[in-house]
Amino acid sequence: MYKRQGTIQLLREICSRDAAVRVLPTGTLTKGHEGKALAPLGTMKKAGVVAVTDTTSGVQNNEIMRRALEYAAMFDLVVLDHCQDSSMTEGGQMHEGAWSLRLGLRGLPRAAEEVVVSSDCLLAELTKARIHLQHLSSGGSAEIVRRAKAKQLSVTAEVSALHLLLTDAA
């Protein structure tokens, strides 16, 4: 039995009874959200998890992500990915552009997101897995997702309200 199975079942019971919205449990994609070794996806699926994610850290290794997508597809789990190449964003404080330069703040280049969106879409095509790309912020990422959807890949994406309202152009 998965050691968190009781917690997942309790959460599902409480939410089905008390929540005003439908709540679906997610599990970790890699052990400890470290991006190094896959978590026990099969046992989490049996416990009631419907999707897996490494939350805001994202998986930084493409081989681990490929294996994770293959494994998740075996159990019909959706992989939720935070698309950001941390090697390009370390110390970043805001969108890279005129305002970051003017304020003297290290910027987060849109390429840091788009390179992960691209690789995730390629890996989703290779593995036939379902993937959801979280809180995208660039038009380039949206275009990559459009192309993936045109190929009938199981790729979905979303943008956060913060990315729509708090831009450097506002």
Predicted regions: what they are:
Residues 8-9, 117:
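Short, surface-exposed alpha-helical segments at coil->helix boundaries
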Residues 13-28:
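A glycine-rich helix N-cap at a beta->alpha junction
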Residues 10-14, 43:
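Generic beta-strand or strand-like secondary-structure segments
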